[in-house]
């Protein structure tokens, strides 16, 4: 009905390796893998009108591999900005995009005289259970400070799977419902929308 502004993110996440010297971002033997996923993202979505920002990946440290993917994207993309959270204030991001930072941190950043990149929270207000408190305080800053430009609530939609019931019908299942061990139980239920993309009735996205 209203349309969506979308950030397309390369399928790169390696936070299990940490952000220090062992990070795959710093290991040039992984450059081809980083470039391949960045190329595929761009070629798949370059003509999609809803894509307004590219993201190099998520929680994967920063280093030579993300510098090269940034350089390549900027060489082929002349209009849309490129963001990467772990780049922080290094050159290989056009947006200062942090996750789960407090309102005070945002205020401190936008009050600086030396900034030229907007602040956008690439994740905030982890929407699990009766969550998302404090949204008004964030949006007071977003609406009053030109360089504070919003954020992405994690997560947009639950990630449960349909499972058939013995007596007929089906349910939306989560960790453990398939006999899987170990599992994270209901941790995949952390979205604003249900797994079937319908609205929750309580609390509702409008709340």
Give the residues covered by each predicted segment.
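Aromatic-lined ligand-binding clefts that engage carbohydrates, nucleic acids, or primary amines
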Residues: 206
């Amino acid at each position: 009905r209203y349309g969506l502004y979308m950030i397309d993110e390369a399928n790169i996440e390696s936070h299990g390796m940490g952000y220090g010297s062992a990070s795959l971002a710093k290991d040039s033997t992984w450059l081809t893998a980083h470039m391949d996923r960045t190329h595929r993202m761009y070629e798949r979505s370059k003509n999609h009108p809803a894509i307004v920002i590219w993201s190099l990946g998520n929680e994967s440290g920063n280093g030579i591999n993300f510098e090269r993917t940034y350089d390549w994207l900027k060489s082929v993309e002349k209009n849309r900005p490129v963001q990467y959270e772990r780049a922080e204030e290094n050159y290989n991001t056009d947006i200062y995009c942090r996750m789960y930072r407090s309102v005070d941190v945002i205020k401190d950043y936008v009050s600086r005289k030396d900034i030229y990149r907007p602040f956008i929270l690439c994740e905030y207000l982890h929407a699990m259970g009766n969550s998302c408190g404090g949204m008004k305080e964030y949006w007071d800053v977003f609406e009053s400070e030109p360089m504070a430009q919003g954020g992405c609530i994690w997560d947009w939609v639950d990630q449960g799977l349909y499972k058939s019931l013995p007596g007929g019908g089906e349910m939306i299942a989560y960790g453990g419902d398939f006999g899987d061990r170990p599992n994270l139980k209901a941790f995949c239920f952390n979205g604003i929308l249900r797994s079937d993309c319908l609205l929750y009735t309580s609390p509702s996205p409008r709340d």
